[in-house]
Regions:
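Glycine-/charge-enriched secondary-structure boundary and capping motifs
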Residues: 2-7, 16, 22, 65, ...
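Active-site loop/lid in soluble adenylation, ligation, and acyl-transfer enzymes
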Residues: 13
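Glycine-rich phosphate/pyrophosphate-binding loop regions near the starts of catalytic domains
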Residues: 20-173
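Short, glycine-/Ser/Thr-/acidic-enriched flexible segments
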Residues: 52, 150-154, 173-175, 229-230, ...
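Short secondary-structure boundary/capping elements
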Residues: 72-79, 203-206, 255
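A short secondary-structure junction signal
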Residues: 158-159, 178-182
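Short, compositionally biased
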Residues: 180-191
Length: 311
């Protein structure tokens, strides 16, 4: 079973994006840039994203064994803020959008608390949002959660990516927030225990502090890619078409091997298909000079490979 069989057609989505790309030169980026003041070189960066069908699994876990939905709030914030980091920006504030057929007080308060906690973690305010009851548009008990954020660009641009630069992968906390349309299809046929369900629902890592630590240690960041839908191929969105990555390890899994191997075994996806669908243990890729590897101030990363010319 592949992602398309599960109901998600990435190739079609890419094709549609190409068709509308003439409408804006911002399409295809992790977040959109807006020049606020050309003279002062002040740019804003904005992003919008959601948690996707992971919410359905989280709702099921709450109904089954009273698992809190706070983690979904963190997922929402992380999906947006991690994208803003890829555009060399510092987040300023966050807004949420929650829609449902009928409001459930417990669900609502838990999700909002998770959003607030995640905003506090990255030191930004939750300044508002929208809550919509939409009877007839959702099945009973369903919820959709999206987020919006604005950041300000750092004054110093990323340095140019060069041949020989290293690509490091900062580890994920698990599956994060993509691939769940496929995961949910698998769970219908192959139910898992509560422990494995908890692993699947582990909230998306917020990488704000990792990037902040790299900057504080004067590590020259050349490019950042958030590994979500599209998996490892997302790094191509921030690289020139003249270069590519030579990966050091043929093994597709870097962390959380048990849960990703379970997905692969049950879905029969190839290694390449897995890396183009799931994060496989890497939630964010960062390109740095090889000489600065020793200056990375945290340990939860792997050296994935180096930048080489396209053949």
């Amino acid at each position: 079973m592949d992602y398309k069989t599960a109901g998600v057609n990435i190739a079609l989505a890419d094709s549609l994006i190409n068709k509308i790309s003439s409408k804006s030169d911002q399409i295809g980026k992790f977040a959109a840039n807006f020049t606020l003041d050309k003279k002062l070189n002040r740019d804003l960066v904005a992003s919008c994203d959601g948690v996707g069908t992971k919410i359905l699994l989280a709702l099921e876990a709450k109904r089954k064994y009273n698992r809190s939905l706070k983690s979904i709030g963190q997922d929402c914030v992380a999906m947006v803020i991690n994208d803003i980091l890829c555009e060399n920006a510092e987040p300023l504030f966050f807004m949420d959008y929650l829609s449902t057929s009928k409001l459930n007080e417990s669900d609502y308060l838990e999700i909002i608390q998770g959003i607030q906690d995640a905003c506090e973690y990255v030191n930004i305010p939750l300044i508002g949002g929208e809550t919509a009851e939409l009877p007839g548009m959702f099945t009973e008990g369903s919820v959709d959660v999206c987020g919006f954020a604005v950041g300000t660009k750092h004054f110093l641009d990323f340095s140019k990516v060069e041949l020989g630069d290293l690509v490091i992968g900062i580890h994920s906390t698990g599956v994060h927030s993509n691939g769940f349309s496929l995961v949910r299809k698998l769970l219908i046929e192959y139910p898992v225990c509560d422990e494995h369900m908890e692993q699947l629902l582990e909230p998306t890592q917020l990488y704000h502090n990792h990037i902040k630590m790299l900057r504080s240690n004067f590590v020259d960041i050349k490019a950042i890619a958030h590994i979500t839908g599209g998996g490892f191929s997302n790094i191509n969105r921030v690289l020139s078409k003249l270069v590519t990555i030579q990966y050091y390890d043929a093994d597709p899994f870097y962390e959380h091997e048990e849960i990703f191997k379970w997905i692969q075994n049950k879905s029969q996806l190839s290694n390449i298909e897995m890396q183009n669908t799931f994060n496989c243990g890497i939630g964010m890729m960062v390109v740095i000079p090889a000489t600065r590897l020793k200056d990375i101030p945290f340990s939860d990363y792997s050296v994935l490979g180096k930048i080489i010319p396209c053949s």
